[in-house]
UniProtKB/Swiss-Prot annotation:
Gene Ontology cellular component annotations, sorted alphabetically: cytoplasm
Family: Belongs to the FKBP-type PPIase family. Tig subfamily.
Catalytic reaction equation(s): [protein]-peptidylproline (omega=180) = [protein]-peptidylproline (omega=0)
UniProt EC number: 5.2.1.8
Protein name: Trigger factor
Lineage: Bacteria, Bacillati, Actinomycetota, Actinomycetes, Mycobacteriales
Domain (PPIase FKBP-type) ranges: 162-243
Gene name linked to the record: tig
Domain topic, free-text comment: Consists of 3 domains; the N-terminus binds the ribosome, the middle domain has PPIase activity, while the C-terminus has intrinsic chaperone activity on its own.
Amino acid sequence: MKSTVEKLSPTRVRINVEVPFTELEPDIDRAFKQLAKQIRLPGFRPGKAPRKLLEARVGRGAVLEQVVNDALPARYSEAVTAESLQPIGQPEIEVTKLEDNEELVFTAEVDVRPDIDLPDLGALKITVDPISVTDEDVDAEIEALQKRFGTLTGVDRAAEDGDFVSIDLSATVDGKDVPEANTEGLSHEVGSGQLIEGLDEAIIGLKADESKVFTTTLVAGEHAGQEAEVTVTVKSIKVRELPEVDDDFAQLASEFDTVEELRADLKEKISRFKRVQQAEAIRDKAIEVLLEQTEIPVPEAVVQAQVDDTLHNAIHGLDHDEDKFAESLKEQGSSREEFDADNRANAEKAIKTQLLMDSIADKLEIQVGQNDLTERLVLMSRQYGLEPQQLLQMLQQNNQLPAMFADVRRGLTVAAVVHGATVTDTDGAEIDTAEFFGPSGEQAEAEQDEAAPAEDATEETDADSDEAADDSK
């Protein structure tokens, strides 16, 4: 088999393949065996009919068509391997020549990973905001705990901002009742702004069993976007009483005995949360800087496929109704034009990022270990509420393991990029990235060197123990 490659663009090639008929003999034999099992000829047992009789029955052309269909995928893969190509997406294959007993010639056009001129990774500089945990941060968490363990007590007065009320609602549009907007005994925190616009203002000043009518725009249902007359009736008013922040409260709200211990724990949790946010900012900034410094051609067909997939997922829940989709976007303050523009921009950025990370991974020779895959599998199984083995079977059935492998490799690549970069905060302080990106190569080697003497000492101790045991026998 011979193959050549024509570069159509930085991201697309045409592979020309010539296959001598002698190399197709195994495929021809296989085709006749399949036909022999499918076709019954008088005087012959199933699967035992001679080639000539089978060929006479179905025709030589049908046999060759079956041979070509069976042979193309393997010959295409062989050509891709021989030419060291890295396809992304499915090929467009065309048979250009098929001469019996001579040769099969076909072409395959396919998008491929482009050659990317990478910047100097060692010169990469990443700057993010510094981390600080203030007393106000801790106070906010304490207040949240107070609210969680607070009690609601009824009051005999008009509703105020921050009160908790039970309300009945009804609405009309153009004088006609809107059944889906009617509700009774709805709990609501005054001032939260969680329901319809104008509700909080209407409630404030009302006492129990008092009502008020106000005008608002409905945001959901059949009458979404229409102006409605809404009647709100207050049924009860309660105020939240917060517990005093003392050691008893600490014991009620946590596993700690004192407020001091509780505050220290909250401070550490806030610090870790902010460190996680900072690590995410470092990752995003590293990718952002690399994308700015690198020219990355993207295959249009791959971009369009992702654009179509995102659109399909967005509109699928609306029964693919374009009008409903447009109305949904309007409710969110957007439009179809904005959605399409954002969708394409996001698709292009995502594909550029993948191509960039894959190229860097190749350059740095990033290897994915079994532990890396296991950690990702366990993490994903927790997110989906499945057993790891159950999730693994689902990924295998849906052929998603290669995608998971690629994603893990890209994550390891980002970590390697961060290790090689200079990472500081805006105050100029260098940031230790080991907590979330793992130790650098030098740090890992140093840790192994430190662990080695301890392991040797353990082995010597075990040997001494064995000798002592032998002596005692």
